[in-house]
């Protein structure tokens, strides 16, 4: 299993989701993508996209006043 970190802090929506989709597309099943972001819309958009695609959210936490980290495991 590979764990890749994607730092999209300061990027506005929808770019965190676009970059997450591109990064996960290059990964294999079971790999994890740790996405750090500060776009409030992505707090809903990324988990919704992951669920629709069948990927698992293995970790989701707030890191600071207005930033989050979410880990998506590729299906």
Swiss-Prot record:
Disruption phenotype: The tsuB-cysA double deletion mutant cannot grow with thiosulfate as sole sulfur source. It comes from the Bacteria. The active site is at 13 (cysteine persulfide intermediate). Gene3D superfamilies: TusA-like domain. Pfam families: TusA. Induction: Member of the CysB regulon. mRNA levels are increased by disruption of the rppH gene, which encodes a RNA pyrophosphohydrolase. Coiled coil: none annotated. Involved in thiosulfate metabolism. Belongs to the sulfur carrier protein TusA family. This is Putative sulfur carrier protein TsuB. It comes from Escherichia coli (strain K12). The gene is tsuB.
């Amino acid at each position: 299993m590979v764990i890749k970190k994607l730092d999209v802090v300061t990027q506005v929506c929808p770019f965190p989701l676009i970059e997450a989709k591109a990064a996960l597309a290059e990964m294999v099943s079971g790999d994890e993508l740790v996405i750090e972001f500060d776009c409030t819309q992505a707090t809903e958009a990324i988990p919704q996209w992951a669920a629709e695609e069948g990927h698992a959210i293995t970790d989701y936490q707030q890191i600071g006043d207005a930033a989050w980290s979410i880990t998506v495991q590729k299906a």
